[in-house]
């Protein structure tokens, strides 16, 4: 079953009123000091008076706030049009979800950017990291049966599944209200906040390099005393803490430039901290993963592994990734583990995209890389589920949602069962494998391929084999005269008559329910002269 546990930041009882215009679905909501921004969500209940002729039941729903006029008024879209013009009509209760934040990061060039007198009037100012507004990215952890929720530069919330899906997550009393990241240290069970407040409950005292941890077995107590295990530590080497991860025997903490270890020692110090690496920072809060005690992560210009020491991973596609990545959207970089295939995959935004559209995968057993185009914004490996579970955010989608939200603008998330079946959400998957160019006698002789014998296991549907030929390494490739060759499950051999100094083999399929596994293909090759 599904439920919405998004925390509620404000509730109002009986003082909401509505302004309507005859024949219009646009409704102005009156609520003094509402604190909402466009894109937030509000749920009304207990509506009275059928405001402007709109039935109470039509307003007792969840709405997206379309436009904010001022601190006391905003606009929603009613499911039905008003039948009269009214001002401050009816009454209602309201529950406001926490501010949605932005679905993308951007550089703020607004009034006040830079120092007085910088450059000339009308000239764009250089970007400033202190003025980068980040997308709202969440992280989750478990504290026993409870779920811990926190978003970057936000507060920390908890949700108890025993309360049921009708009960929302609530702020953890006594916890910091502004942190970069949070997780639970195990097995000692401290709640640890990274890049958090010097003074608990005072957001403007946030220190992006300060680590604070709660009392053991008590996530509501962060103030250290002589009789508890709460405390804190400021790290060095970096401008801000980016993320943290439980690993073998310690918590790994990444700043934008370095890696640190946090180990549980017990009283009187509780935790010990040491720097493990430099010039190896992490690109985003979800860009590091642990596989059997070995950590893999993506920085702003390379990939790294920590297995006791920090090492840069040789990457054959490094230029492809880092010369075409949108660093402004680094907050969205997300890593997923697929243990079934020994893979670690990072999803990221290409240079011209504000939303995830690319991935790069590293097979840590075979030390090979591959790349592709796919949008996934969250990933859970097998374990709790039989197959990996992933989500995709589509900023342009207007499809129906699981819960009815009136006035909902574009932007939807989809949930996928990964590695299940051979199609992609009901559509064919374009599958392919290419060989390198091969030759005879280091390319001195022409090469004649007269035929090949296909060898495909578990083949369902047809696939295509193509032969690309070229006379010189720098020459353009051209297909053979009989290209392409369609291979059915019963094809025994294929005559080709392909001639060139170098030949590349390409195998492709793009049919619904297509499935195949490449075996050992045999080809009939021979020398065919020097020109």
What are these regions (language model features)?
Residues 30-35, 76-85, 152, 162, ...:
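Secondary-structure transition/turn motif
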Residues 119-133, 164-333:
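Beta-propeller and closely related beta-pinwheel folds
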Residues 144-146, 188-192, 250-252, 295, ...:
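Entry beta-strands of beta-propeller and related beta-repeat scaffolds
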Residues 145-159:
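Hydrophobic or amphipathic alpha-helical targeting/insertion segments
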Residues 150, 193-194, 254, 262, ...:
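Residue-level marker for isolated small/hydroxyl-bearing positions within beta-strands
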């Amino acid at each position: 079953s599904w439920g919405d546990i998004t925390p509620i930041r404000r509730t109002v009882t009986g003082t909401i009123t509505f302004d309507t215009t005859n024949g219009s679905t646009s409704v102005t909501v009156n609520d003094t000091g509402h604190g909402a921004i466009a894109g937030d969500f509000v749920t009304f209940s207990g509506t009275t008076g059928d405001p402007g002729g709109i039935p109470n039941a039509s307003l007792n729903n969840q709405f997206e706030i379309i436009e904010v006029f001022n601190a006391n008024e905003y606009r929603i879209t009613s499911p039905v049009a008003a039948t009269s013009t009214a001002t401050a009509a009816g009454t209602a209760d309201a529950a406001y979800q926490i501010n949605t934040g932005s679905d993308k990061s951007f550089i703020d060039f607004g009034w006040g950017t830079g120092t007085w007198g910088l450059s000339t009037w009308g000239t764009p100012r250089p970007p400033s990291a202190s003025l980068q507004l980040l997308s709202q990215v969440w992280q989750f952890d478990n504290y026993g049966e409870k779920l811990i929720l926190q978003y970057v530069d936000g507060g920390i919330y908890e949700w108890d599944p025993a309360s049921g899906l009708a009960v929302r997550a609530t702020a953890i009393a006594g916890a910091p209200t502004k942190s970069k990241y949070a997780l639970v240290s195990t097995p000692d069970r401290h709640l640890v906040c990274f890049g958090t407040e010097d003074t608990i409950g005072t957001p403007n005292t946030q220190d992006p390099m300060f680590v604070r941890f709660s009392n053991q077995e008590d996530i509501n107590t962060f103030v250290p005393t002589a009789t508890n295990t709460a405390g804190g530590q400021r790290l060095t080497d970096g401008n801000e803490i980016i993320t943290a991860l439980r690993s073998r025997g310690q918590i790994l903490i990444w700043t934008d430039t370095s890696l640190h270890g946090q180990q549980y020692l017990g009283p009187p110090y509780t935790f010990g901290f040491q720097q493990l690496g430099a010039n190896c920072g992490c690109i985003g809060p979800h860009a590091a993963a642990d596989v059997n005690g070995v950590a893999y992560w993506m920085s702003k210009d390379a990939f790294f592994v920590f297995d006791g020491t920090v090492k840069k991973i040789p990457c054959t596609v490094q230029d492809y990734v880092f010369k075409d990545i949108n660093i402004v959207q680094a907050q969205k970089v997300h890593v997923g583990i697929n243990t079934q295939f020994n893979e670690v995959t990072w999803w990221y935004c290409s240079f011209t995209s504000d939303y995830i559209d690319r991935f790069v995968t590293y097979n840590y057993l075979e030390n090979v890389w591959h790349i592709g185009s796919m949008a996934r914004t969250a990933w859970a490996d097998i374990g709790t589920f039989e197959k990996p579970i992933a989500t995709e955010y589509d900023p342009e989608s207007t499809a129906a949602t699981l819960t009815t939200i009136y006035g909902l603008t574009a932007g939807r998330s989809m949930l996928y069962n990964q590695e299940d079946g051979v199609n992609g959400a009901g559509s064919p998957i374009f599958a392919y494998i290419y060989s390198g160019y091969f030759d005879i006698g280091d390319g001195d002789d022409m090469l004649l391929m007269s035929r090949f014998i296909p060898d495909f296991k578990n083949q369902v549907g047809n696939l295509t084999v193509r032969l690309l030929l070229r006379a010189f390494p720098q020459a353009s490739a051209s297909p053979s005269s009989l290209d392409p060759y369609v291979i059915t499950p019963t094809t025994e051999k294929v005559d080709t008559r392909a001639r060139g100094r170098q030949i590349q083999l390409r195998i492709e399929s793009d049919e619904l329910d297509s499935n195949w596994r490449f075996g050992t293909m045999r080809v009939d090759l021979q020398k065919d002269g020097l020109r």
